[in-house]
Amino acid sequence: MRTIQLRRYTLVDGEYDAFLAWWDEWMPRVRSAAGFVIEFAYGIRETNEFVWAVSAEGDHEAFIATEQAYMVSPERAEAFDGMPKQVAEYNIRFADDVRIAGVTG
Protein backbone atom coordinates (compact mmCIF):
# COMPACT_ATOMS: atom_id res chain seq x y z
CA MET A 1 0.00 0.00 0.00
CA ARG A 2 1.20 3.50 -0.87
CA THR A 3 -0.22 6.81 0.27
CA ILE A 4 -0.17 9.67 -2.23
CA GLN A 5 -0.17 13.36 -1.44
CA LEU A 6 -1.14 15.84 -4.16
CA ARG A 7 0.63 19.19 -3.82
CA ARG A 8 -0.60 22.22 -5.78
CA TYR A 9 1.29 25.49 -5.53
CA THR A 10 0.57 28.95 -6.87
CA LEU A 11 3.96 30.56 -7.31
CA VAL A 12 4.91 34.15 -6.58
CA ASP A 13 4.82 36.25 -9.77
CA GLY A 14 8.21 36.23 -11.46
CA GLU A 15 9.47 33.17 -9.53
CA TYR A 16 8.36 30.38 -11.88
CA ASP A 17 11.75 29.62 -13.47
CA ALA A 18 13.71 30.08 -10.24
CA PHE A 19 11.33 27.81 -8.35
CA LEU A 20 11.52 25.06 -10.99
CA ALA A 21 15.33 25.23 -10.98
CA TRP A 22 15.41 25.00 -7.17
CA TRP A 23 12.84 22.20 -7.05
CA ASP A 24 14.66 20.17 -9.72
CA GLU A 25 17.97 20.57 -7.89
CA TRP A 26 16.70 19.59 -4.45
CA MET A 27 13.38 17.78 -4.24
CA PRO A 28 14.11 14.55 -6.13
CA ARG A 29 17.22 13.96 -4.03
CA VAL A 30 15.92 15.14 -0.65
CA ARG A 31 12.49 13.53 -0.87
CA SER A 32 13.95 10.24 -2.11
CA ALA A 33 16.46 10.15 0.76
CA ALA A 34 13.54 10.57 3.18
CA GLY A 35 11.69 7.55 1.77
CA PHE A 36 9.35 9.26 -0.68
CA VAL A 37 8.71 8.68 -4.38
CA ILE A 38 7.87 11.65 -6.59
CA GLU A 39 5.04 10.36 -8.76
CA PHE A 40 4.88 13.29 -11.18
CA ALA A 41 5.50 17.02 -11.44
CA TYR A 42 3.97 19.52 -13.88
CA GLY A 43 4.24 23.25 -14.23
CA ILE A 44 1.68 25.60 -15.77
CA ARG A 45 3.58 28.75 -16.68
CA GLU A 46 0.52 30.76 -17.79
CA THR A 47 -1.03 30.57 -14.33
CA ASN A 48 2.15 30.34 -12.22
CA GLU A 49 1.15 26.90 -10.97
CA PHE A 50 3.19 23.86 -10.03
CA VAL A 51 1.48 20.53 -9.33
CA TRP A 52 3.18 17.41 -8.10
CA ALA A 53 2.50 14.22 -6.20
CA VAL A 54 4.66 12.45 -3.67
CA SER A 55 4.04 9.03 -2.19
CA ALA A 56 5.34 6.82 0.59
CA GLU A 57 4.88 3.21 1.58
CA GLY A 58 2.14 2.56 4.09
CA ASP A 59 -1.10 4.12 5.18
CA HIS A 60 -1.98 7.74 5.96
CA GLU A 61 -0.44 7.57 9.45
CA ALA A 62 2.80 6.09 8.07
CA PHE A 63 2.98 8.91 5.51
CA ILE A 64 2.53 11.51 8.25
CA ALA A 65 5.31 9.90 10.32
CA THR A 66 7.64 9.91 7.30
CA GLU A 67 6.70 13.52 6.58
CA GLN A 68 7.38 14.58 10.18
CA ALA A 69 10.86 13.03 10.05
CA TYR A 70 11.51 14.71 6.69
CA MET A 71 10.42 18.13 7.99
CA VAL A 72 13.14 18.13 10.69
CA SER A 73 15.86 16.48 8.60
CA PRO A 74 19.17 18.28 7.98
CA GLU A 75 18.78 17.55 4.25
CA ARG A 76 15.52 19.47 4.10
CA ALA A 77 17.00 22.30 6.16
CA GLU A 78 19.88 22.55 3.69
CA ALA A 79 17.50 22.59 0.71
CA PHE A 80 15.46 25.44 2.17
CA ASP A 81 18.37 27.45 3.63
CA GLY A 82 18.25 30.97 2.21
CA MET A 83 15.43 30.17 -0.20
CA PRO A 84 13.33 33.27 -0.89
CA LYS A 85 9.54 33.08 -0.78
CA GLN A 86 8.59 31.53 -4.10
CA VAL A 87 5.23 29.94 -3.26
CA ALA A 88 2.28 32.26 -2.69
CA GLU A 89 -0.30 29.56 -1.94
CA TYR A 90 -0.16 25.89 -0.99
CA ASN A 91 -2.94 23.35 -1.52
CA ILE A 92 -1.87 19.98 -0.13
CA ARG A 93 -4.22 17.01 0.15
CA PHE A 94 -4.09 13.25 0.31
CA ALA A 95 -5.35 11.60 -2.88
CA ASP A 96 -7.50 8.52 -3.22
CA ASP A 97 -6.25 5.72 -5.45
CA VAL A 98 -9.06 5.45 -7.99
CA ARG A 99 -8.95 2.57 -10.47
CA ILE A 100 -10.77 3.21 -13.73
CA ALA A 101 -11.52 0.35 -16.12
CA GLY A 102 -9.37 0.51 -19.25
CA VAL A 103 -6.89 3.01 -17.80
CA THR A 104 -3.43 1.79 -16.86
CA GLY A 105 -0.93 3.51 -14.66
Language model segments and positions:
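Long, low-complexity, Ser/Thr/Gly/Pro-rich intrinsically disordered segments that act as flexible linkers
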Residues: 43-48, 84-105
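Short, surface-exposed ligand-recognition loops at beta-strand->loop->(often short) alpha-helix junctions
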Residues: 10-20
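Extended hydrophobic/Leu-rich segments
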Residues: 26, 48-49
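Residues that cap or initiate secondary-structure elements
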Residues: 13-15, 58-60, 98
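An amphipathic, aromatic/His-enriched active-site/gating alpha helix that lines ligand/cofactor pockets
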Residues: 18-40, 55-93
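Short, surface-exposed beta-edge/turn micro-motifs
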Residues: 2, 49-50
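Short hydrophobic/aromatic beta-strand micro-patches
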Residues: 10, 53-55
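Active-site-flanking beta-strand signature of metal-NTP-handling nucleotidyl enzymes
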Residues: 4-8
